[in-house]
């Protein structure tokens, strides 16, 4: 993020413009004659000077094409790996790096080849080598955050294909390391209020575990085995424009089946759902905020459950 400060100094007929990067805490000060600022014909000149800020901020760099693009991105990843970054900085930098990786064809393959051939641990594929390097540099949570925040809007685009390729590589890496579903959900959560049932998050979670049922169970356990939290998250996701109705209905039915298999009669299910709305359960499990179920939502859920339980 760039912040600009503009100060007029009439006594010496000068204008001072300071641009500051929130990423690096670096600042560039520009001094212009006041007449140049007042004359809009000089806008291009002033804008060119202000673009010197790009040297301070990675996401403003003009990335080259061809071999130079590969070299530039490798240099960026290696530089990020050499410096000590706090969690917030890692989140920002990995998102920018991820966007560049999926921006052009075969960047993933070329950069993966570099890390595959580099001294160090052996890898089976180029993609595995790149995924390992990204996780080492930005952490599991950083990589998970990049996946959740960089999915291209057009699922048929080349970028979407590249994003899918990277996600598969990370999921395969985590499986190979023996990560449990709890590990994966905790990485995706990253301490924030995450919509686990959003298409990007849920699809990636399923890639990392064995099935949709395993993904649902991992989310349920993350919510402290609280059905109120679980149903609230599902219903909230259903309101989104990009909601996947099939997946969400299946996730809702999974929760119903859990109680039906325990032989919970409908009245007991209703009382259980209401009980988990109490403050005693609000602080258990995951700390992220959620909206409690409304009375009408509880009534609808109970009605749906009664149809399943009676079958």
Curated annotation (Swiss-Prot):
One of its GO terms (cellular component) is host cell nucleus. Gene3D superfamilies: 1.20.5.2710. Residues 210-311 are annotated as: WY domain 2. Residues 1-15 form the signal peptide. Keywords: Host cytoplasm, Repeat, Secreted, Signal, Virulence. It is found in: Secreted; Host cytoplasm. The keyword Cell division does not apply. InterPro entries: ATR1_N (IPR053992), ATR1_WY-dom (IPR048935). The ATR1 effector protein of Hyaloperonospora arabidopsidis is a polymorphic member of the RXLR class of secreted effectors. The ATR1 alleles are differentially recognized by RPP1 genes from different Arabidopsis ecotypes (Niederzenz, Wassilewskija, Estland and Zdarec). Monomer. Interacts with defense protein RPP1 from several ecotypes including RPP1-NdA, RPP1-WsB, RPP1-EstA and RPP1-ZdrA, via their leucine-rich repeats (LLRs). The RxLR-dEER motif acts to carry the protein into the host cell cytoplasm through binding to cell surface phosphatidylinositol-3-phosphate (PIP). However ATR1 does not bind to PIPs, even though it harbors the RxLR-dEER motif at the N-terminus, suggesting that the RxLR-dEER motif is insufficient for PIP binding. This is Avirulence protein ATR1. It comes from Hyaloperonospora arabidopsidis (strain Emoy2).
